[in-house]
Amino acid sequence: MPPSGLRLLPLLLPLLWLLMLTPGRPVAGLSTCKTIDMELVKRKGIEAIRGQILSKLRLASPPSQGDVPPGPLPEAILALYNSTRDRVAGESAETEPEPEADYYAKEVTRVLMVEYGNKIYDKMKSSSHSIYMFFNTSELREAVPEPVLLSRADVRLLRLKLKVEQHVELYQKYSNNSWRYLSNRLLAPSDSPEWLSFDVTGVVRQWLTHREEIEGFRLSAHCSCDSKDNTLQVDINGFSSGRRGDLATIHGMNRPFLLLMATPLERAQHLHSSRHRRALDTNYCFSSTEKNCCVRQLYIDFRKDLGWKWIHEPKGYHANFCLGPCPYIWSLDTQYSKVLALYNQHNPGASAAPCCVPQALEPLPIVYYVGRKPKVEQLSNMIVRSCKCS
């Protein structure tokens, strides 16, 4: 068990950036943050990383450098390190950072399925194996004007009584009338209604981009090779046309719908600029003169900066850090200015503004010696890949 201080270092690392602030003039745009001494930032960052590496390896102090054998690493150890490094690089390329809009509060909207019996459904061949759900995309765009504003989308279905266990599958309709598999669910028998939910965030983002008038899903019974009966046994509310009057109205209100969580357009106007549509990652921040919240370069040379010779690979790495103001999206003529004034009165040294913090972090594989035995280990959350205001 490492000392309690070392165990807390990964949690305290974001706070160290706040301690780097030096007295100075507040920046513009209603930010209460102060000017920053970049050399102090880097020195503090290097010391934080020193403690973080030792903590992750459960070491109270660096290993004795005299025990490190000279010469190249064994081939097997080098191959293991290279494969670990390549895997991390591959995972990093596949990972997409969360949209910047995820910082803001979300508005929840419900978009009902086009009512069963509409002529749209006439195009689908009647089947005991499947049911179809179509949605008017103009209603989707009214709720979510731009794909970047969408945070989450679920298709929700009210399952009524089910006498037998059934395996169901959800599919997305393509414009060429083909179907793409999305997800599946094993439903247990029950006498009570139950809401089923499927995450379709990626699909709805596609719909908002493609501009088709009608889009849809298909819910089907799982087709097993050794099963002769592929009938969809589950009864989903909203697909019976025999009801009349008030009962039909109540029944229709609970028909399948899309539950959307999105940032209101007026709350995220700054996302409209191409600059803010970019992820605040190394690809953007390192090639621009961005002054607001962004990833800043910080290279750690293990020998030069930390005085360590016991880490054999890599010789150093780009730790990076987040820096830059997060301007308010409110103005002084709002009611919030009274709250802000009261907050500053009771917390004169604190910042009421959002802070620039890491959003995506990558691990760092290393090779080091314990005595005369080489070890390959992966240190989690060591490289800042992108930032956000939070």
Curated annotation (Swiss-Prot):
What is the designated name of this protein?
Transforming growth factor beta-1 proprotein
Subunit annotation:
Homodimer; disulfide-linked. Interacts with the serine proteases, HTRA1 and HTRA3: the interaction with either inhibits TGFB1-mediated signaling and the HTRA protease activity is required for this inhibition. May interact with THSD4; this interaction may lead to sequestration by FBN1 microfibril assembly and attenuation of TGFB signaling. Interacts with CD109, DPT and ASPN. Interacts with EFEMP2. Interacts with TSKU; the interaction contributes to regulation of the hair cycle. Interacts with TGFBR3.
Query: Is Magnesium given among the entry's keywords?
Result: no
Q: Where is this region: Arm domain?
A: 75-271
- Positions annotated as glycosylated: N82, N136, N176
Q: Per UniProt, what is the name of the gene that codes for the protein in this document? A: TGFB1
Species: Ovis aries (Sheep)
Would you indicate the residue range of the signal peptide? 1-29
Pfam entry (one): TGF_beta
* Function description: Transforming growth factor beta-1 proprotein: Precursor of the Latency-associated peptide (LAP) and Transforming growth factor beta-1 (TGF-beta-1) chains, which constitute the regulatory and active subunit of TGF-beta-1, respectively.
Protein's GO biological process: ATP biosynthetic process; cell-cell junction organization; cellular response to transforming growth factor beta stimulus; chondrocyte differentiation; epithelial to mesenchymal transition; extracellular matrix assembly; extrinsic apoptotic signaling pathway; hematopoietic progenitor cell differentiation
